């Protein structure tokens, strides 16, 4: 791993249907073994299910779900004087959306419905209404950060630029 500079952020093209970079990242997270067409089919079919079953705008449901699941605090492990402390740190927007999509996909995978399309549609709809396993995961993360608020003065080290 090079110590000279951080890797460049890759430019992700927006998806074809809704012209959204966020949805494109979500599709990339769904994708397994490079099968992007299948991942797109799963997501767009789940969107159709949301539209038919719940009579709701699927993209609006998706963006509400992502915003509801996105955490604003998390704990990072910091070593101080031979002890590790769980220090609450704010989550930047990009990481927040990455965590949200990961949690939604994990929660959807563990659901009892038969097909991933149904699982994803239901989890997205529940998350948009502040229910479901993904929302529970966010709340647990925030509880951990709240419980370790006393260690917030041990903020993680900032890397020096230019050295």
Swiss-Prot record:
Any one Gene Ontology cellular component term annotated for this protein: small ribosomal subunit
Q: Which CDD domains match?
A: uS7_Bacteria
Keyword rRNA-binding annotated: yes
Q: PROSITE patterns under this entry? A: RIBOSOMAL_S7 (PS00052)
Kindly list the GO molecular function terms attached to this UniProt entry.
rRNA binding; structural constituent of ribosome; tRNA binding
Could you list this entry's UniProt keywords, alphabetically sorted. Ribonucleoprotein, Ribosomal protein, RNA-binding, rRNA-binding, tRNA-binding
| InterPro entries attached to this UniProt entry | Ribosomal_uS7, Ribosomal_uS7_bac/org-type, Ribosomal_uS7_CS, Ribosomal_uS7_dom, Ribosomal_uS7_dom_sf
One GO process term, biological-process aspect: translation
State how it assembles: Part of the 30S ribosomal subunit. Contacts proteins S9 and S11.
Q: What's this protein's function?
A: One of the primary rRNA binding proteins, it binds directly to 16S rRNA where it nucleates assembly of the head domain of the 30S subunit. Is located at the subunit interface close to the decoding center, probably blocks exit of the E-site tRNA.
Q: What NCBIfam families does its record include?
A: rpsG_bact
Family indicated by similarity: Belongs to the universal ribosomal protein uS7 family.
Entries under HAMAP family matching the protein: Ribosomal_uS7_B (MF_00480_B)
Identification of the protein by name: Small ribosomal subunit protein uS7
Organism equals Rickettsia bellii (strain RML369-C)
